[in-house]
């Protein structure tokens, strides 16, 4: 299912499919937040911002919800409740 990274829930694993290079900070690219890479939601701060991700089972990134909204993803599996 395609969506954006800001709509993922804790435990969701998704594949980054697309983003606008002009809207994504270069530091995220350096840390592996690239199309084709997996991201997993580790934690979401109170009020939903920022969102803490694991990228490719290694880099941990806290991304503002506004930035996560610009990252298109395809959910690979959802958290099991």
Feature-to-residue mapping (PLM):
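C-terminal structural segments of small proteins and small subunits
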Residues: 51-81
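Short, Lys/Arg- and Gly-enriched loop/turn segments at beta-strand edges
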Residues: 26, 46-54
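Short alpha-helix capping/helix-loop boundary micro-motifs
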Residues: 1-2, 23-27
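Short beta-strand-turn/beta-hairpin segments enriched in glycine/proline and small hydrophobics
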Residues: 5-7, 13
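A structural micro-motif recognizing beta-strand termini
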Residues: 18-22, 56
């Amino acid at each position: 299912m395609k969506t954006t990274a800001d709509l993922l829930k804790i435990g969701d694993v998704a594949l980054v499919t697309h983003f606008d290079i002009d809207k994504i900070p270069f530091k995220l690219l350096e840390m592996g937040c690239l199309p084709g890479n997996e991201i997993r939601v580790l934690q979401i701060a109170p009020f939903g911002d920022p969102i803490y991700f694991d990228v490719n089972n290694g880099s941990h990134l806290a991304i503002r919800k506004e930035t996560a909204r610009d990252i298109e993803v395809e959910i690979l599996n959802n958290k099991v409740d």
